[in-house]
């Protein structure tokens, strides 16, 4: 489940952060950053029950359990698990973009007559999203850890739920195997994010 959420949350967070940076001090900046602050402050184990209480019990507009069985049954688990990480990525994207947009090479690109779209996509985003790429490794670790809680709350048949059930049943073989798998995934994605950040940053490549 965590792997499914990673790409979607990164895209949503990057879009919100880049938009907030380009529209600084406007409603397109204030509203996404206010929502991002809420997502950062509210932990996963509290966000899940709150969403279930509001949308599943009180409003009765979304199912509160299952995965792939009913229309809309992926919405609440996705929001619970991915909201906080999309919020972190949005703030990182905004900060990175604001820093890059004030650099001399951006002013030079604009002075050459490049369109604002080309300046943002070709020049600004490459440097502005380096903090997001560096955050990918810890984000994957957090998504994997958060899947334990979310899969248990929403009764999703994933590795996180199996891990929790194995702990209650004292199934040490399952606990050991799942721990090794999660550890290998975390190490792999940390290495991948470091390599991607090195590739995106020319100064790091020159120093190495």
Language model region names:
Residues 10, 27-39:
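N-terminal signal-anchor/first transmembrane alpha helix
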Residues 34-63, 80-84, 91:
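Membrane-water interface segments at the C-terminal ends of transmembrane alpha-helices
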Residues 3-4, 8-27, 44, 67-208:
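Alpha-helical transmembrane segments of integral membrane proteins
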């Amino acid at each position: 489940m965590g792997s499914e959420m990673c790409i979607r949350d990164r895209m949503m967070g990057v879009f919100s952060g880049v938009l907030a940076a380009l529209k600084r001090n406007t409603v397109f900046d204030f509203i996404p950053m206010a929502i991002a602050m809420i997502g950062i402050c509210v932990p996963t184990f509290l966000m899940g029950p709150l969403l279930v209480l509001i949308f599943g019990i009180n409003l009765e507009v979304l199912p509160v359990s299952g995965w792939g069985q009913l229309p809309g049954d992926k919405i609440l688990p996705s929001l619970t698990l991915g909201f906080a990480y999309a919020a972190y990525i949005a703030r990182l994207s905004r900060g990175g973009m604001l820093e890059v947009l004030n650099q001399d090479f951006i002013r030079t690109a604009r002075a050459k007559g490049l369109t604002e779209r080309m300046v943002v996509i070709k020049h600004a985003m490459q440097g502005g999203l380096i903090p997001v790429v560096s955050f990918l490794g810890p984000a994957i670790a957090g998504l994997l850890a958060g899947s334990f809680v979310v899969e248990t709350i929403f009764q999703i048949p994933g590795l996180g739920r199996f891990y929790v059930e194995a702990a209650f049943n004292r199934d040490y073989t399952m606990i050991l195997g799942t721990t090794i798998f999660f550890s290998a995934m975390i190490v792999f994605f940390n290495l991948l994010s470091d390599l991607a950040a090195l590739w995106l940053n020319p100064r790091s490549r020159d120093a190495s």
